[in-house]
Amino acid sequence: MKLATYKDGSRDGQLVVVARDLSVAHYATGIAHRLQQVLDDWNFLSPQLQDLYDALNRSRDSSGVASPARHAFPIDPRQCMAPLPRAYQWVNGSAYRNPQAPPDAGRQGSGPWLYQGASDDFWGPCDAVPCASEADGIDFEAEVAVITGDVRLGASPAQALDGVRLLLLANALCLRQLLPGELAQGLGPLQSRPITAFSPVAVTPDEVGTAWAQGRLALTLQSSWNGRKVGRCEAGAEVRFHFGHLIAHLCKTRRLRAGAIIGAGAVSDPDASHGYSCIADKRALETLQDGRSLTEFMKFGDTIRIEMKGRDGQSVFGAIEQEIVPLEPATAAL
């Protein structure tokens, strides 16, 4: 099934069930108001949502018109919040090996490299991204992420995968010029990781069929910067640590509670002709080939679109479409 959260003036929004073709949605009010409620009681509530999802898809006739018997409405991605607008935990990592670029601190070592990000204020898929300065090195990061249920302390990678409830896409914004100084302090990124946005829709793994296997999502992640396609990266390629590894690593000394979100980092493809999912990887490749980086980071007014299509050619999660805007006094207000 496919789930989204619609804006309703509150911080947590309203849970909606979305048709498979992403054309219409139906409020899940009679079952649950918030996605976190469903994650907390997954075994009881998710079958009810599945029934609504099946009915919503059945209500669409061969012409693609929704039956008036269903209280469905055309979905507008601009009205979507992040599927989980705020979460108990957001942990992002660097699961990919990029053979085209020199290894960095995030890709070295025997185990996964993870950092704890801000989870109290996720951004919607079409929300503009305010930044204080272009000099901070504004970079997008197109990623695949998962939302988990409870995962026990000491879970193995296989057991950890049993805790995956939903898949989604992320844009984990990074301010590259601030990152080295923070990493040098030894405490991980803070100011350099200001905003994370998510796809309008989160989906259960069965929605992608055999493309989800062994903790990897074997589909192409597409990134378009200012309308120009810069990345068609295979998300299942060059995965050094799959989601089972990432979650098990996190659970080595703690347990996870339902509603934790885990990201795998910018998708990196072994074939350089497939482009990139973050500007930093492109600049690293340029430095390796030419001795210096030529591609600049994002500027005010730039846009980024991140999307993944299934093997049927249809969008799986909907698209993240964001514009970089200068921070204004009104924007900075609560």
PLM regions and their residue ranges:
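Short, Lys/Arg- and Gly-enriched loop/turn segments at beta-strand edges
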Residues: G154-S156, P270-C278, R311-E321
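Short, well-ordered loop/turn sites that connect or cap secondary structure elements
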Residues: L250, R255-L256, M298
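Active-site pocket scaffolds in enzymes
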Residues: I261-G301, E307-K309
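Structural signal for terminal/edge beta-strands and the immediately following C-terminal loop/tail
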Residues: R305-L334
